[in-house]
């Protein structure tokens, strides 16, 4: 009985601290465009553009946990409380370029796009780049207010599409988009047939086959 009581007490704080997606976010995506610039000895990060798009297709559980370490991290905090409400890791082409000899004598800039869930209230976003020893090379923190008139709204006009495989729950599935690049409008029937064949090929293999 003592062991069970102790276990219940130990588990209580974890349950109390469990984060609910709907407490801080709405079902939309905030796209943040950054510019990474610099060379082997000096780097900088700048915000380029903010966009909001319909629906959020990323994680809704374990929002503040990192899946893998990566060479960089994006951290979202609730501005009012300072609580971490979303984190993710990444590795970029810019960081890969910094490991090349060219970066010792040249300065370049790279465009980078990050997606986070759209917040209900003002957030503080911190982006940091790390070296191979996980030491922070450069970092940027900036605020995002959902009411900011400079945030562009995109993707609200419907784009023609056809569903090949309907998920039972669209919030807990992998979304695959087949893009008709290289096909003319008259070749849409051919494209759809090719897409269906590609889709069937995917579901012929595990783990997709048994989870279809």
Question: At which residue positions do the language-model features occur?
Answer:
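Bacterial Sec-dependent N-terminal signal peptides
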Residues: 1-20
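Composition- and surface-driven signal marking solvent-exposed, interaction-prone regions
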Residues: 18, 88-90, 191, 199
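Beta-strand-enriched, solvent-exposed domains that form extended recognition/catalytic surfaces
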Residues: 24-149
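Fold-level signature of zinc-dependent metallopeptidase catalytic domains
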Residues: 149-209
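Short N-terminal helix-initiation segments at or just after the protein's N-terminus
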Residues: 17-22, 122-123, 158-163
């Amino acid at each position: 009985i003592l062991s069970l009581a102790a276990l219940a007490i130990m588990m209580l704080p974890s349950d109390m601290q469990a984060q609910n997606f709907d407490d801080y976010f709405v079902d939309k995506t905030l796209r943040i465009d950054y510019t990474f610039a610099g060379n082997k000895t000096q780097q900088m990060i700048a915000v380029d553009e903010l966009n909001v798009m319909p629906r959020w297709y990323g994680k809704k559980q374990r929002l503040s946990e990192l899946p893998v370490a990566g060479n960089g991290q994006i951290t979202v905090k609730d501005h009012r409380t300072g609580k971490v409400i979303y984190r993710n890791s990444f590795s970029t082409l810019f960081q890969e370029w910094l490991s090349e000899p060219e970066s010792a004598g040249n300065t370049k800039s790279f465009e980078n796009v990050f997606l986070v869930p759209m917040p209900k209230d003002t957030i503080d976003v911190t982006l940091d780049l790390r070296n191979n020893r996980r030491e922070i090379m450069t970092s940027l923190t900036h605020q995002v207010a959902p009411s900011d008139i400079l945030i562009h709204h995109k993707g609200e006009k419907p784009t023609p599409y056809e569903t090949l495989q309907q998920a039972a729950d669209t919030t807990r599935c992998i979304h695959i988009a087949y893009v008709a690049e290289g096909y003319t409008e008259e070749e849409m029937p051919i494209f759809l047939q090719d897409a269906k064949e590609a889709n069937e090929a995917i579901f012929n293999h595990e783990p997709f086959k048994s989870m279809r």
